[in-house]
Swiss-Prot record:
It comes from Streptococcus mutans serotype c (strain ATCC 700610 / UA159). Keywords: Cytoplasm, Flavoprotein, FMN, Isomerase, Isoprene biosynthesis, Magnesium, Metal-binding, NADP. Involved in the biosynthesis of isoprenoids. Catalyzes the 1,3-allylic rearrangement of the homoallylic substrate isopentenyl (IPP) to its allylic isomer, dimethylallyl diphosphate (DMAPP). The keyword Disulfide bond does not apply. It comes from the Bacteria. Substrate binds at residues 4-5, 146. This is Isopentenyl-diphosphate delta-isomerase. NCBIfam families: IPP_isom_2 (TIGR02151). The keyword Magnesium applies. One of its GO terms (cellular component) is cytoplasm. GO terms for biological process: isoprenoid biosynthetic process. SUPFAM superfamilies: FMN-linked oxidoreductases (SSF51395). Its cofactor is FMN; NADPH; Mg(2+).
Amino acid sequence: MTNRKDDHIKYALDYRSPYNSFDDIELIHHSLPDYDLAEIDLSTHFAGQDFDFPFYINAMTGGSQKGKEVNEKLAQVADTCGLLFVTGSYSTALKNPDDTSYQVKKSRPHLLLATNIGLDKPYQAGLQAVRDLQPLFLQVHINLMQELLMPEGEREFRSWKKHLSDYAKKLQLPFILKEVGFGMDVKTIQTAIDLGVKTVDISGRGGTSFAYIENRRGGNRSYLNQWGQTTAQVLLNAQPLMDKVEILASGGIRHPLDIIKALVLGAKAVGLSRTMLELVEQHSVHEVIAIVNGWKEDLRLIMCALNCQTIAELRNVDYLLYGRLREGQRQ
């Protein structure tokens, strides 16, 4: 397990998607704003919580010494910058009580913390993660293609809908259903809504590719490395469901402009995984904190140029679609 978790970090950093759907979106500049820059409000609300900023550090790793080091750095960045931090899957800690790679809040009592577990795990496992870490919410990831590509992956999936229903009915804490970079299709989102899910992270293609990661770990199905739908495509497809469920976006988010574009397409907030992993691997924690704080100002700047005072107002921004993204909307 330790080697697998470390492989995930190594190969996630290696991968570069050949296409990012956010490059096919052009936002329409507004020349005469109604607001001062200081009036721009970055706050948002999802999963029953208010957050000061519309982006967060999404689930990545844990379960190894390397994972612990990464989590400590990310937690320090999140705590200092006032961002939400979601740990990687807690399943390894359930198997190993001595695993402390997720225990990042003990020295940071004010950290905005959430944790993650796979949908292959029953409700009781998620409940144990909640009891151990006391998170703001539980993120439940759905990773079908990754499981199929892993030699040691799951092969029985009939229980997944029951697990999801159990979380929706029994968990006395908000939870989010999260894809892992393959894009959550509209039918799956609707099924989740029918089962009682209130918030989903559609996590599309364009960032971390677990197909690539598992193929680098020894698989021979590299033709599936680009499996799934891109983040922007999923957001566009999910427009009819925006009033029925809270939608978060992740997958291929590189910088503040990508964050804004995802918010324009209806996301309540935006998660970053690989980008944050790369930052803490290439820079000191203090340098990353400075970069992230700079992003906050960049978001305000872009919102001012779009004449938007709040995150909700971004939904009214005009935009143009190009290339693959535009072609996808014609079908």
